[in-house]
Amino acid sequence: EVKQESLSGITEGEAKEFHKIFTSSILVFFGVAAFAHLLVWIWRPWVPGPNGYS
């Protein structure tokens, strides 16, 4: 069996660990961003009503 070396130089276990940390941090980032957008929408909706923002 010929062992193929990775292009990045990290092992498969290290790659899986990195992937787990990366995906969880992306989910946290998107969660914070979605919450911030919700707060801004509550404060001032992007589509004003018939009377504008008054």
Swiss-Prot record:
Entry keywords, A to Z: Antenna complex, Bacteriochlorophyll, Cell inner membrane, Cell membrane, Chlorophyll, Chromophore, Light-harvesting polypeptide, Magnesium, Membrane, Metal-binding, Transmembrane, Transmembrane helix
GO MF annotation, one: bacteriochlorophyll binding
Ranges per topology, Periplasmic: 44-54
Main location: membrane
Compartment(s): Cell inner membrane
Cytoplasmic-facing ranges: 1-20
InterPro entries in the cross-refs: Antenna_a/b, Antenna_beta_CS, Antenna_beta_dom_sf, LHB-1/5, Light-harvesting_complex
Chain segments annotated as transmembrane: 21-43
Top-level taxon in the UniProt lineage: Bacteria
GO cellular component: plasma membrane; plasma membrane light-harvesting complex
NCBIfam families in the cross-refs: pufB_517_ASD
Entry function: Antenna complexes are light-harvesting systems, which transfer the excitation energy to the reaction centers.
Protein name: Light-harvesting protein B-870 beta chain
Species assigned in the record: Rhodospirillum rubrum
